[in-house]
């Protein structure tokens, strides 16, 4: 019996050894494939106003995608930490909530933290600051005018009787609350406004898609008492009516919102408001 078992083992051993060799070869091939570098080029807008004689230019960096996270912001952070500490950009939450890392990536305005790196190694990823804005440095745009416009619409609840302020809740029906969906989620990243040709040419007077969508959000809030006053502020030829429904704003919004629709709704409300004023 022992001889039979030994013979059986000898017969099985060569097959087991062959299988083990195949497994090791397969694992070795996988390891080699995983270790093969995947070099990706990034051409990034650079300009430092504090550097004498410096002019806007593109600077190219190379990164091995095997050692980098999947998002464009991961690449930017890797470049700043490991290659060029002078590269300047905004970032904070890294999950599409704060809007800080808004920039133009491969021709479209979006958030660097939610935009995946194009893994086509033959293409250079091009990164610019938000278009048609003054640049503070590198990928950092000056949003002073944008924030001033946002402040001008008074983005908060306004009550004509404030005697009960802080004493009771301003209740809202489920239906009225649902009207705010698709509006309050705006993170003020300015991707939409800086993709709008009308805002490019009239940014000092036209409020732009982001601010107008926020204006609409407060106009239709059932708890707010200043809808007509808010409309009255937008009657001039520029604040609202420079929108020509190009719809770049809706196409580029990283949160999937529809500023163009909100602006159209304001125009409807404005028509009703003007009719009421004319008949008064």
Curated annotation (Swiss-Prot):
Regulation: Enol-oxaloacetate inhibits the succinate dehydrogenase activity.
PROSITE patterns per UniProt: 2FE2S_FER_1 (PS00197), 2FE2S_FER_2 (PS51085), 4FE4S_FER_1 (PS00198), 4FE4S_FER_2 (PS51379)
Region of interest: Interaction with SDHAF1: 146-218
Mode of membrane association: Peripheral membrane protein
Pathway info: Carbohydrate metabolism; tricarboxylic acid cycle; fumarate from succinate (eukaryal route): step 1/1
A single GO cellular-component term on record: mitochondrial inner membrane
Modified residues (N6-acetyllysine): 51, 55
Residue interval of the organelle targeting sequence: 1-28
Binding annotation for [3Fe-4S] cluster: 196, 243, 249
Domain of life: Eukaryota
Segments forming domain 4Fe-4S ferredoxin-type: 176-206
GO biological process: aerobic respiration; respiratory electron transport chain; tricarboxylic acid cycle
Family annotation (CDD domains): fer2
Protein family membership: Belongs to the succinate dehydrogenase/fumarate reductase iron-sulfur protein family.
Protein name: Succinate dehydrogenase [ubiquinone] iron-sulfur subunit, mitochondrial
Organism per entry: Bos taurus
């Amino acid at each position: 019996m022992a001889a039979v078992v030994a013979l059986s083992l000898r017969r099985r051993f060569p097959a087991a050894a062959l299988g083990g060799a195949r497994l090791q070869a397969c694992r070795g091939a996988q390891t080699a494939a995983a270790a093969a570098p995947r070099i990706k080029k990034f051409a990034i807008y650079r300009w430092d106003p504090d550097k004498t004689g410096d002019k806007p230019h593109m600077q190219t960096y190379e990164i091995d995608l095997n050692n980098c996270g999947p998002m464009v912001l991961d690449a930017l952070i890797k470049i700043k930490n490991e290659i060029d500490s002078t590269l300047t950009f905004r970032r904070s939450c890294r999950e599409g909530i704060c809007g800080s890392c808004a920039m133009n990536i491969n021709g479209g305005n979006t958030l660097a933290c939610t935009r995946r790196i194009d893994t086509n190694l033959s293409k250079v990823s091009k990164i610019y600051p938000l278009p048609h804005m003054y640049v503070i440095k590198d990928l950092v745009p000056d949003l002073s005018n944008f924030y001033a416009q946002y402040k001008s619409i008074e983005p908060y609840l306004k009550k004509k009787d404030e005697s009960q302020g802080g004493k009771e809740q301003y209740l809202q029906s489920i239906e009225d609350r649902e009207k705010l969906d698709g509006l309050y989620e705006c993170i003020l990243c300015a991707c939409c406004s800086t993709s709008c040709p009308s805002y490019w040419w009239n940014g000092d007077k036209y409020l732009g898609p982001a601010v107008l969508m926020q204006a609409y959000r407060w106009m239709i809030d059932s708890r707010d008492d200043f809808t007509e006053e808010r409309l009255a502020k937008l009657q001039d030829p520029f604040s609202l009516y420079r929108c020509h429904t190009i719809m770049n704003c809706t196409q580029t919004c990283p949160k999937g919102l529809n500023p163009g629709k909100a602006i159209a709704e304001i125009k409807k409300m404005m028509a009703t408001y003007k009719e009421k004023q004319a008949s008064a």
